[in-house]
Amino acid sequence: IPKNLTRAQWFTIQHIQPSPLQXNKAMNGVNXYT
């Protein structure tokens, strides 16, 4: 976690702008439901 962010801010950023790995997991999850 960057020292200039609070845990809550970092948590929010991670959900607004997921890392590529998280995005890939999310896409795989969506694809599984389609």
Swiss-Prot record:
GO molecular function: lyase activity; ribonuclease A activity
Gene3D superfamilies: Ribonuclease A-like domain
Signal peptide, first to last residue: none
Keyword terms of this UniProt record: Endonuclease, Glycoprotein, Hydrolase, Lyase, Lysosome, Nuclease
GO terms for cellular component: lysosome
Catalytic function, reaction form: an [RNA] containing cytidine + H2O = an [RNA]-3'-cytidine-3'-phosphate + a 5'-hydroxy-ribonucleotide-3'-[RNA]; an [RNA] containing uridine + H2O = an [RNA]-3'-uridine-3'-phosphate + a 5'-hydroxy-ribonucleotide-3'-[RNA]
Chief localisation class: other
Top class in the EC scheme: lyase
Active site (record annotation): 15
Source organism, top-level taxon: Eukaryota
Positions annotated as glycosylated: 4
InterPro entries: RNaseA-like_dom_sf (IPR036816)
Location within or outside the cell: Lysosome
Enzyme Commission numbers on file: 4.6.1.18
KW Glycoprotein (keyword) present: yes
Family: Belongs to the pancreatic ribonuclease family.
Protein name in UniProt: Ribonuclease PL1
Organism (species): Sus scrofa
